[in-house]
């Protein structure tokens, strides 16, 4: 019996050569089905979950753990120190210790394999019962995930040790069990030398966070099954190769049966001990090799995830089944040919995303419902692939990917991003065993999943001979799949795929360590013929994904550019509460973790509760499988629907169309579509339209599900498009001016000066101008104030994450947009009105104000405002802007106003309608998915509450805006907010924001793009920068009648 003190003295958690003791080697998951029916339907596995309430006590270090951890009973004094904790869970989210978020840097001094002596250690105790029938069999305890290392005892006897937080730790405890109650005790150590291999841009959380189970198998049992289905060269017929490892002292047979549903397709029984394979070391009497021939099976792809079921049985001489395992089988080939990645002979386009296992409350302890929610959202938003960034996922995840249809890059739990150099441990032979175990154990566990089409050696740990060894082993063990690895430059000898990070479409990125060529350039490098699939791209941090459509244009134009994986799926925010009880999503530093990387974990397509960021709609649109083009004829339109599906027919889709006139629907229809893979169908649309002179016409297209499917309900929108229609009226709208003079005379436009105020009155409106400030300070319409603040120039936006880059509060990046803007004082310029002139004509009043802007005693900008108020009480503002040559590209060119905040009973005033792009937030470089129309939303819904507050809510290409009784006409972008830019700029969380007593309205002539190729360098493309020094624009305001 090994005491706690003896185990602690071994110091295994600081020895890179010791990453396990007594752990069972990797193998396919065990189920031990008793009946064929159970095997076919994955029911009643001989697997007993030990999840639930366990006893728990946290110590500051392993050395503090008492021997009473192993005691059968605890004294009252000892028992008082223990509480209960739910398993699985992360103890930091149950009130113990604190979460830490880091991206690159380690949360402890870097001195491998040494970790801090202050090393939180969680001790767990539980009991479980075993029957006499179980005692006669083989019993293994399996911990699916423990962070980061742990020692285990059963009934006071030492069991073993394990590292690798993301793979099963399985131990044979058959000889330690007794009939009736049995005791388990685990000592879980937060920091181990294994932590140096798990520096993965996520929260550092600890504990038993995945399932714990007892698996009971016969003494003579199936140990491992490797199923390899292979289609022939014509992708018609197939073979299924099955390698079965058995633990049997008696003469046994192995039977394999392939089922399609409950129907047997083919089967075979082989005598195990007479089917030896011989190599230089002799025969393999514990391994049986079998092959099944299958005629014209249905294929598995992400589009058509058809599954068969193979049942493997261990049979004794009497014909009795001793043990039985079963696995899903998908017939698909993965090949590398002519510089492309092929699935079943077709070059796939990876519509992928990187996904961390994360829950806003439970942290890393996710369950099947959480996984299923993600699977359905991925399918609903046109994703076909997932990279398990950056570790093997929960085993149920792969089963769901098999069932629902997602391609998977399965990634080993290895990242040493914070090491310098990054590849230091990858070149150290002391760490080679740990590297190899993490990779091989993953492959052994997951090898039978058809969804896994690529193995990944890990992430961001440089390149060394260990990677070459891992690559060589993978190609030998499983030649049916390619291997990818980005480390060392994305194109080393250890990868079959060029897998760069954040490479741009046309621009090379300077990098001191490794080159980051433009993806188009990578294709043309001498001697290079591998496909390019971005393992990470389009960094979705906050308000991001600008120019995402440029990637997809390139992917579709260049056959060897085969897509990529967006970073990343979900914001890794954790739910926290203010002192007053208000919930908000926390990021690095919010739990007292002083060494952190702030909000760099907030870079998902979804908020932590799985509601979408606006940029998810852009990704969905760019990745959709159908495209549309229109040919006009005399009395109808021919709509061509082209399919990019490689394998499936559109047999469950309805095409709904709608004609818009000036943004409003006037006629609509629908029809089913049946498009073959990579083919097109023409649909005739013959709407009766009475075209009006000067009107704008658009055709909206939605392709929706006709019936429910596994991942969405009927009516779910899959693909969208908007096509402009030519106005066939051929007429120019006629505007009569015959009665203008009389109307003006009757309206009585008057100008009156009162001290420093100029009052312009017309109809039921009074406009007040300050003759010193040059600003419109008040607008009364029927005695109601329209403005809460003057109209004025606006050049500032609350910086986005992409504007801030890698800047820290005390260490700003001088190249970041935010730093350039702050050096230029944008948002803090001193304004001086140099003149105000009034001109009254027969039809209107014109007030001209000239402004100068100074910063640090330097003239930095000048603007000219011409306010024109006509006889209809319409206010037209014409603005000229002149910027100093020293200024950087501007965040925006426009004006701002404020209107009274609506009261809760003023429902109509709480809604905003506009004619322009929408309905969701869109920016000049992220608007491909938005559609022109007349949209209406509440003021609250027009805002996007990013976890780290920034500018948000823009709507582009607008012609009209109606808000709070005010109408704006022109050509502009706009946003509406309950929070001013200063508040958005200074707030760190949504809980910091307090609605003000007005609603801010921002009208932009030009607004800089959001960027998003990455978030640490200026990534807004040149076409979406505001670089000119002179601008002129106009908008017209009027009271909405």
From Swiss-Prot:
List its EC numbers.
Answer: 3.2.1.23
| Keywords, alphabetical | Glycosidase, Hydrolase, Magnesium, Metal-binding, Sodium
The biological processes this protein is annotated with in GO are: lactose catabolic process
One Gene Ontology cellular component annotation? beta-galactosidase complex
Question: Quick one: which residues bind Na(+)?
Answer: 201, 600, 603
State the needed cofactors, names only. Mg(2+); Na(+)
The cofactor note reads: Binds 2 magnesium ions per monomer.
User: Per its UniProt record, what Pfam families does this chain match?
Assistant: Bgal_small_N (PF02929), Glyco_hydro_2 (PF00703), Glyco_hydro_2_C (PF02836), Glyco_hydro_2_N (PF02837), LacZ_4 (PF16353)
Recorded catalytic reaction(s): these are: Hydrolysis of terminal non-reducing beta-D-galactose residues in beta-D-galactosides
Q: What residues bind substrate, as annotated?
A: 103, 201, 460, 536-539, 603, 1016
Positions with a binding annotation for Mg(2+) 2:
596
Q: Which Gene3D superfamilies match?
A: 2.70.98.10, Galactose-binding domain-like, Glycosidases, Immunoglobulins
For the ligand (Mg(2+) 1), the binding residues are 415, 417, 460
What's its top-level EC category?
Answer: hydrolase
Q: Where is this site: Transition state stabilizer?
A: 356, 390
Q: Which residues does UniProt mark as catalytic?
A: 460, 536
Kindly list the GO molecular function terms attached to this UniProt entry: beta-galactosidase activity; carbohydrate binding; magnesium ion binding
Q: Where are the transmembrane segments?
A: none
Quaternary structure, from the entry:
Homotetramer.
Give the similarity note. Belongs to the glycosyl hydrolase 2 family.
PANTHER family registered for this protein in UniProt: BETA-GALACTOSIDASE
* Record-given protein name: Beta-galactosidase
């Amino acid at each position: 019996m090994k005491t706690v003190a003896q185990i602690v003295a071994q110091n295994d958690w600081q020895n890179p050569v010791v990453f396990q003791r007594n752990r069972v080697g990797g193998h396919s998951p065990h189920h031990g089905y008793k009946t064929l029916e159970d095997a076919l339907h994955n029911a009643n596995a001989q697997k007993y979950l030990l999840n639930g309430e366990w006893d728990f006590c946290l110590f500051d270090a392993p050395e503090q753990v008492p021997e009473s951890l192993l005691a059968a009973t605890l004294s009252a004094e000892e028992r008082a120190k223990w509480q209960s904790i739910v398993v699985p869970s992360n103890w930091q989210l149950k009130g113990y210790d604190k979460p830490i978020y880091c991206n690159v840097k380690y949360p402890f001094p870097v001195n491998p394999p040494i970790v801090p002596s202050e090393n939180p250690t969680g001790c767990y105790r539980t009991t479980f019962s075993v029957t006499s029938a179980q005692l006669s069999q083989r019993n293994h305890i399996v911990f699916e995930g423990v962070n980061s290392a742990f020692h285990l005892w059963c009934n006071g006897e030492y069991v073993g040790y394990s590292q690798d937080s993301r793979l099963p730790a399985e131990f044979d405890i058959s000889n330690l069990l007794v009939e009736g109650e049995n005791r388990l005790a685990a000592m879980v150590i937060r920091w181990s030398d294994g932590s140096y291999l798990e520096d993965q841009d996520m929260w550092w959380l600890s504990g038993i966070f995945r399932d714990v189970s007892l698996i009971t198998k016969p003494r003579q049992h199936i140990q491992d099954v490797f199923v390899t289905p292979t289609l022939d060269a014509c992708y018609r017929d197939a073979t299924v190769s099955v390698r079965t490892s058995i633990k049997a002292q008696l003469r046994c047979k192995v039977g394999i049966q392939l089922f399609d549903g409950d129907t047997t397709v083919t089967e075979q029984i082989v005598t195990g001990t007479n089917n030896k394979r011989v190599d230089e070391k002799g025969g393999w009497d514990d391994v049986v090799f079998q092959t099944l021939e299958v005629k014209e099976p249905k294929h598995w792809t992400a589009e058509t995830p058809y599954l068969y079921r193979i049942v493997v049985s261990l049979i004794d001489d009497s014909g009795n089944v001793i043990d039985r395992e079963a696995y899903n089988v998908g017939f698909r080939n993965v090949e590398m040919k002519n510089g492309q990645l092929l699935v079943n002979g077709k070059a796939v386009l990876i519509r992928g995303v990187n996904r961390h296992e994360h829950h806003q409350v439970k942290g890393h302890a996710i369950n099947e419902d959480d996984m299923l929610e993600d699977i359905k959202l991925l399918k609903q938003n046109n994703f076909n692939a997932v990279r398990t960034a950056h570790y093997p996922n929960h085993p149920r995840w792969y089963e769901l990917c098999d069932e629902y249809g997602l391609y998977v890059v399965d990634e080993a739990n290895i990242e040493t991003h914070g090491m310098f150099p990054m590849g230091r441990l990858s070149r150290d032979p002391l760490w080679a065993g740990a590297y190899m175990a993490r990779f091989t154990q993953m492959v052994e566990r997951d090898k039978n999943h058809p969804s896994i089409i690529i193995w990944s050696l890990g992430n961001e740990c440089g390149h060394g001979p260990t990677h070459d060894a891992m690559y060589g082993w993978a190609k030998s063990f499983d030649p049916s799949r390619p291997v990818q690895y980005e480390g060392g430059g994305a194109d080393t000898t250890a990868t079959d795929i060029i897998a760069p990070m954040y490479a741009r479409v046309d621009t090379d990125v300077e990098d001191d360590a490794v080159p980051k060529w433009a993806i188009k350039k990578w294709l043309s490098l001498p001697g290079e013929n591998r496909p390019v699939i971005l393992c990470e791209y389009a960094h979705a941090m906050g308000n991001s994904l600008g120019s995402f459509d440029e990637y997809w244009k390139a992917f579709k134009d260049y056959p060897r550019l085969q897509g990529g994986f967006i970073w990343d799926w979900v914001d890794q925010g954790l739910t926290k509460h203010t002192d007053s009880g208000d919930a908000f999503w926390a990021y690095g530093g919010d739990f007292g973790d002083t060494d952190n990387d702030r909000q760099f974990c907030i870079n998902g397509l979804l908020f932590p509760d799985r509601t979408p960021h606006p940029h998810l709609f852009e990704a969905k649109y760019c990745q959709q499988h159908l495209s549309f083009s229109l040919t006009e004829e005399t009395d109808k339109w021919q709509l061509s629907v082209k399919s990019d599906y490689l394998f499936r027919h559109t047999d469950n889709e309805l095409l709904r169309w709608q004609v818009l006139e000036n943004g409003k629907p006037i006629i609509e229809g629908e029809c089913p579509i049946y498009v073959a893979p990579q083919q097109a169908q023409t649909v005739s649309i013959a709407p009766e339209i009475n075209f009006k002179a000067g009107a704008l016409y658009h055709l909206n297209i939605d392709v929706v599900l006709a019936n429910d499917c596994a991942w969405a309900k009927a009516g779910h929108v899959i693909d969208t498009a908007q096509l402009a229609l030519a106005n066939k009226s051929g007429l120019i709208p006629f505007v009569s001016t015959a009665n203008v003079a009389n109307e003006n005379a009757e309206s009585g436009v008057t100008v009156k000066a009162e001290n420093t105020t100029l009052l312009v009155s017309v109809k039921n409106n009074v406009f007040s101008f300050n003759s010193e400030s040059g600003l419109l300070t008040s607008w009364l319409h029927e005695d109601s104030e329209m403005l809460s603040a003057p109209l004025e120039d606006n050049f500032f936006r609350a910086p986005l994450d992409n504007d801030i880059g890698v800047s820290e509060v005390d260490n700003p990046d001088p190249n970041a947009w935010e730093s350039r803007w702050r050096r230029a004082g944008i948002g803090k310029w001193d304004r001086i009105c140099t003149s105000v002139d009034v001109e009254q004509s027969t039809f209107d009043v014109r007030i001209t104000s000239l402004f100068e802007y100074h910063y640090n005693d330097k003239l930095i900008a000048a603007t000219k405002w011409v306010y024109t108020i006509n006889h209809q009480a319409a206010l037209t503002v014409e603005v000229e802007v002149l910027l100093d040559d020293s200024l950087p590209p501007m965040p925006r060119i426009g004006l701002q106003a404020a209107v009274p905040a609506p009261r809760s009973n003023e429902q109509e005033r709480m809604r905003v309608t506009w004619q322009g792009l929408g309905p969701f937030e869109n920016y000049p470089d992220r608007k491909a998915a938005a559609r022109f129309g007349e949209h209406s939303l509440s003021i609250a819904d027009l805002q996007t509450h990013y976890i780290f507050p920034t500018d948000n809510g823009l709507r582009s290409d607008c012609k009209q805006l109606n808000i709070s009784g005010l109408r704006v006409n022109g050509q502009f972008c706009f946003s509406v907010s309950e929070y001013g830019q200063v508040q958005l700029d200074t707030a760190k969380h949504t809980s910091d924001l307090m609605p003000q007593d007005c609603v801010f309205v921002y009208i932009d002539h030009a607004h800089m793009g959001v960027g998003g190729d990455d978030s640490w360098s200026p990534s807004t493309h040149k076409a979406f920068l505001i670089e000119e020094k002179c601008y002129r624009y106009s908008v017209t305001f009027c009271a909405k009648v």
